[in-house]
């Protein structure tokens, strides 16, 4: 949608005024920013008509001509084995401190280029197109800068739609995970977070394209399942050494386990040191490799190359029964 000229609504401002008494402009009711940031109806926003056409051309460059073809492979000139040393120092020492997941994306994709989908809507999760060694991928990433990267109703809808789109057009999925949980709250429960969150699990489990998951920090409980864990069909799972893979945070778990223990503080510290790592999960086969952050790009590219011939046979169905 184009700012200032594009508008969409079921009933216009005059009808809204006559029925509800609310005064609202056409731009505020159904303008470009309204549908890009509040309703989620529009996926992209443009400054003017020329910018809109340029964005359409750029988007089509990532996509195949139809669902029977593969996405085009482009020579981007970026070394597939390139490593960015800055990634090793990106995450803050405090595991509860925020960082910008876009910094990770820019460091690992070809030439740092990506195309955001619904950039202004549900900012706690990122959905974008990018390339690895010239191959189009769809990236789904938690954004710790907003709501600590928690999944909520809008984030679940946004990511589910994107996952299914990528699967429909044979575009591999790369998932960057730093998720502490589903957003708690009365309004989330009343709004059906269980039903909306289930859409993500359904979309991932239904997708037959290659799926590569990289855990950067937190991967807790059901929210990690919803971000394409191995159990949801991830073909390859990599974890940074900073990863915490568990049902809940180790500090919270220790407070429950040792709440009546006289040496609670010491045992809590020992528990956190032992379990706030990806190595227990790796021992059990839930993680394929623990990697240095700077190695993320070559590992993802190698995984995608290995999965290039992946094919899954599914029962013929008219359509699946997603929990709408």
What does each of the following model-derived ranges do?
Residues 1-324:
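Ligand-binding clefts of soluble mixed alpha/beta catalytic domains
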């Amino acid at each position: 949608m184009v700012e200032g000229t594009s508008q969409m609504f079921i009933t216009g401002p005059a009808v809204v005024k006559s029925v509800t008494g609310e005064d609202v402009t056409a731009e505020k009711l159904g303008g470009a920013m309204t549908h890009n940031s509040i309703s989620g109806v529009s996926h992209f926003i443009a400054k003017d008509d020329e910018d809109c056409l340029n964005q359409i051309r750029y988007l089509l460059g990532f996509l195949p001509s139809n669902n029977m073809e593969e996405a085009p492979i482009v020579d981007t000139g970026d070394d597939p084995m390139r490593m960015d040393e800055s990634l090793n120092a990106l995450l803050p020492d405090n595991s509860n401190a925020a960082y910008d997941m876009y910094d990770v994306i820019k460091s690992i994709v070809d030439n740092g280029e990506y195309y955001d989908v619904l950039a202004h809507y549900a900012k706690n999760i990122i959905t974008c197109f990018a390339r690895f060694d010239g191959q189009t991928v769809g990236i789904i990433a938690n954004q710790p800068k907003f709501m600590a990267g928690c999944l909520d109703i809008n984030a679940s809808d946004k990511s589910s739609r994107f996952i299914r789109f990528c699967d429909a057009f044979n575009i591999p999925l790369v998932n960057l995970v730093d998720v502490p949980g589903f957003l708690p709250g009365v309004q989330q429960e009343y709004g059906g977070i269980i039903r909306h969150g289930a859409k993500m699990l359904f979309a991932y489990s239904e997708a037959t394209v290659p799926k590569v998951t990289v855990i950067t920090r937190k991967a807790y409980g059901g929210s990690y399942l919803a971000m394409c864990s191995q159990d949801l069909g991830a073909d390859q799972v990599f974890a940074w050494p900073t990863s915490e893979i568990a049902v809940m945070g180790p500090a919270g778990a220790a407070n429950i386990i040792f709440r009546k223990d006289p040496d609670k503080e010491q045992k809590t510290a020992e528990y956190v040191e032992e379990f706030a790592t990806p190595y227990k999960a790796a021992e059990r086969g839930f993680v394929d490799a623990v990697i240095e952050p700077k190695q993320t790009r070559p590992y993802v590219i190698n995984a995608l190359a290995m999965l290039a011939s992946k094919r899954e046979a599914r029962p013929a169905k008219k359509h699946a029964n997603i929990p709408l």
